[in-house]
Amino acid sequence: MPDELWALVEPLIPKFKARPQGGGTAPVDDRAVFTAIVYVLTSGCGWRELPPSFGVTVPTAHRRFTEWTKAALWRRLHQAVLDELGSRGEVDWSRAILDAASVRSKKGAT
């Protein structure tokens, strides 16, 4: 994962909370987990096919995906990327608005 993208992602990731009863395993590197999750989401492979080369177990990757989804990480990251690209003048909002206007809504939707 490029350092520039990680600089946007890292502050948005919820901080690891140690178990109150102690024990458990050492926390896994957030960057490795994020990279593994993005791989699963973009490659078309299933969670069970996550290559071990990422250094993240399937249960850990899936658990963090679920936790981060509940914490709205993906929505906040999307907004952060749009803000960054917008500040550079690299977003064509006229096209985004046109695309949004051409999406058909369901009957009864507001």
Language-model features: where?
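Short alpha-helical elements
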Residues: 1-110
